[in-house]
Amino acid sequence: MKTVRDIAGYLIGLLLFVIMIPLLMWRLSGNVHPGAAVIICFAVLAAAGIGLSVWSIIYMKNVGKGNPMDAFNHEVAPRTVNLMTDGPYRICRNPMLLGVFIYYIGLLICLQSWKAAVVFVAFFAVMMLQVNREEKRLKEDFGEAYIDYCKKTKKLIPYIW
């Protein structure tokens, strides 16, 4: 049963974050014809962002012994049992989300659409609510160790925020 929940969590994340939201951004943007340089920029940012997210997921599974899919305090897949402070979690406390944002910023550059930007801003706002709720739970789960980690590691943007 645990394997089914793991797979479900990964599939939901793939469908929502990698396919559905970018598809919505693209559909709302209308008839877009970016040049080669813009497409290359998108490809580089998409690869970097998705790569960071995948690294974070693998690290979470191997070190944290859990899964990333925990939506607004509803456990979709098994939660992590170990606090992760190394690997991609040394970069920021939410490297998986940072990777998604890098991917979406590449998409925004490619689409050059205010409608896609509105989707991004709405997604960003919802995800920040999720992150704040998740951080409260992590403080409960890991106590002082998590509080110390928060003091040393930025929430989302390395060295800034």
Task: Tell where the protein language model's regions lie, with residue ranges.
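Membrane-anchoring alpha-helices and their flanking helix-loop junctions
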Residues: 1-86, 98-161
